[in-house]
């Protein structure tokens, strides 16, 4: 065993005896692929992260897209880590839209509904789940495109999915 692993295991054991282990692990869990790569000192290209939904390992491109979309790693109580592949992200977005759709607003109506500027409203792409940036939100507003409320969260179309259609 490597010395760091032994020290980490001893620290985890000590903290678990004190009832602090869950707090310790919560502070230590990386939320992005890059943070996980840095913490493990393993290049991203060498990471093997399974998809939580289909159990397939994400490709290098999918690992990079995962961080680009501002998605977060999924940790289990047993300290297993999962991500979400692109195919499952699209399927999940489609499923949520079909099952939990609430309302559609066009352009700047969203600001009136939420009582705050569009730049302060968090939203994701309705197709790929990418977190929308300010330019994407403003583009949707200016072109009078739809915003959809799904499961109490706003969705729009990102520049990549817009280019595909």
Curated annotation (Swiss-Prot):
The protein's name: Protein E6
Primary location recorded for the protein, binned into one broad class: host cell
Compartments (UniProt record): Host cytoplasm; Host nucleus
Pfam families in alphabetical order: E6 (PF00518)
Subunit structure: Forms homodimers. Interacts with ubiquitin-protein ligase UBE3A/E6-AP; this interaction stimulates UBE3A ubiquitin activity. Interacts with host BAK1.
Keywords: Activator, DNA-binding, Early protein, Host cytoplasm, Host nucleus, Host-virus interaction, Inhibition of host innate immune response by virus, Metal-binding, Modulation of host cell apoptosis by virus, Transcription, Transcription regulation, Viral immunoevasion, Zinc, Zinc-finger
Zinc finger annotations (unnamed) as residue ranges: 51-88, 125-161
An annotated GO cellular component: host cell nucleus
Any GO MF annotation of the entry: DNA binding
Biological role stated in the UniProt entry: Plays a major role in the induction and maintenance of cellular transformation. E6 associates with host UBE3A/E6-AP ubiquitin-protein ligase and modulates its activity. Protects host keratinocytes from apoptosis by mediating the degradation of host BAK1. May also inhibit host immune response.
Biological processes, Gene Ontology terms: DNA-templated transcription; regulation of DNA-templated transcription; symbiont-mediated perturbation of host apoptosis; symbiont-mediated perturbation of host ubiquitin-like protein modification; symbiont-mediated suppression of host innate immune response; symbiont-mediated suppression of host type I interferon-mediated signaling pathway
Family of this protein: Belongs to the papillomaviridae E6 protein family.
Organism classification: Viruses, Monodnaviria, Shotokuvirae, Cossaviricota, Papovaviricetes
Keyword Transcription regulation: yes
InterPro entries: E6, E6_sf
Organism for this UniProt entry: Human papillomavirus 22
SUPFAM superfamilies: E6 C-terminal domain-like
Highest taxon above the source species: Viruses
């Amino acid at each position: 065993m490597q010395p760091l692993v032994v020290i980490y295991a001893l620290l985890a054991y000590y903290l678990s005896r004190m009832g602090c282990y869950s707090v310790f692990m919560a502070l230590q869990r990386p939320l992005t692929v890059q943070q996980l790569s840095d913490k493990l000192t393993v290049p991203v290209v060498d990471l093997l992260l399974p998809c939580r939904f289909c159990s397939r390992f994400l490709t290098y491109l999918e690992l990079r897209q995962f961080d680009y979309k501002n998605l977060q790693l999924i940790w289990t109580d047993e300290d297993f880590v999962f991500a979400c592949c692109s195919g499952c992200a699209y399927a999940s977005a489609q499923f949520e839209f079909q099952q939990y759709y609430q309302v559609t607003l066009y352009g700047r109506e969203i600001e009136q509904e939420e009582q705050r500027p569009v730049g302060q409203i968090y939203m994701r792409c309705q197709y790929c789940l990418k977190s929308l940036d300010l330019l994407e939100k403003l583009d949707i507003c200016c072109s009078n495109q739809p915003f959809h409320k799904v499961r109490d969260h706003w969705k729009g179309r990102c520049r990549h999915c817009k280019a595909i259609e």
